[in-house]
């Protein structure tokens, strides 16, 4: 999900509800990106939304590097795992349309917060980090109590999410903003926040990338 994206208003969270996500990263050919976006919108998204337990799909695109990330959200781990066989040919065809090969990861959606719906022109800053596997819970609580309120104060803030892989200690923090201009204006402030947060949480930055939010239709509840 990646990405902190929203295409619908939040639902009420069930007590103790844990939501999951599967992300597919494709290194696309630049001339195939628009065709790939249309394929996700017209073919992949309707197919996934018809599967039991799927509660949303988003697509992030970085035209400069060619990196594209499609993320599907699922009500339960069981629903996500049960969909694997159905999803595989859909994913492989999607990768062909983008002119690349898919790399798949599965996550727990540890946090999701929206200020308002995303609109055309919205962009996402995604930061991949790693913490010791035995400190994932502490990292999640630190994100919710300290990092998220500060992200929410950034210019143009729309929504934010945190995806975690408890086994590896890896996580993806994504923040959606109203426009690229807003994201550009808050970049220095975001970098300062990131440096402080990683130091205090004992985390390591693995990667960061800024994307256009090409598609978003998510019904993931507020998880804060």
From Swiss-Prot:
Origin: domain of life: Bacteria
Cysteines paired by S-S bonds: none
Listed InterPro entries: ABM_dom (IPR007138), Dimeric_a/b-barrel (IPR011008)
Gene3D superfamilies: 3.30.70.100
Pfam families listed in its UniProt record: ABM
Transmembrane segments: none
GO terms (BP aspect): cellular response to starvation
Similarity annotation: To M.tuberculosis Rv2558.
Protein name as it appears in the record: Uncharacterized protein Rv2557
């Amino acid at each position: 999900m990646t990405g902190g994206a929203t295409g619908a208003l939040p639902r009420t969270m069930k007590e103790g509800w844990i939501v999951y996500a599967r992300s597919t990263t494709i290194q696309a050919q630049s001339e195939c990106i628009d065709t790939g976006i249309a394929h996700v919108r017209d073919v992949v998204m309707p197919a996934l939304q018809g599967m039991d337990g799927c509660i949303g799909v988003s697509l992030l695109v970085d035209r400069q590097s060619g990196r594209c990330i499609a993320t599907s959200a699922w009500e339960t781990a069981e629903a996500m795992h049960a969909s694997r066989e159905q999803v595989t040919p859909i994913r492989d065809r999607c990768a062909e349309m983008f002119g690349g090969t898919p790399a798949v990861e599965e996550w727990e959606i540890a946090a999701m917060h929206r200020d308002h719906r995303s609109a055309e022109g919205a962009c996402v800053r995604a930061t991949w980090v790693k913490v010791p596997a035995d400190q994932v819970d502490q990292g999640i609580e630190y994100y919710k109590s300290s990092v998220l309120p500060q992200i929410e104060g950034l210019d143009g803030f729309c929504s934010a999410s945190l995806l975690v892989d408890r086994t590896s200690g890896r996580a993806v923090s994504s923040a959606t903003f109203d426009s690229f201009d807003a994201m550009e204006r808050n970049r220095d402030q975001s970098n300062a926040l990131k440096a402080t947060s990683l130091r205090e949480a004992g985390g390591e930055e693995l990667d960061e990338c800024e994307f256009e939010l090409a598609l978003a239709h998510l019904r993931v509840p507020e998880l804060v």
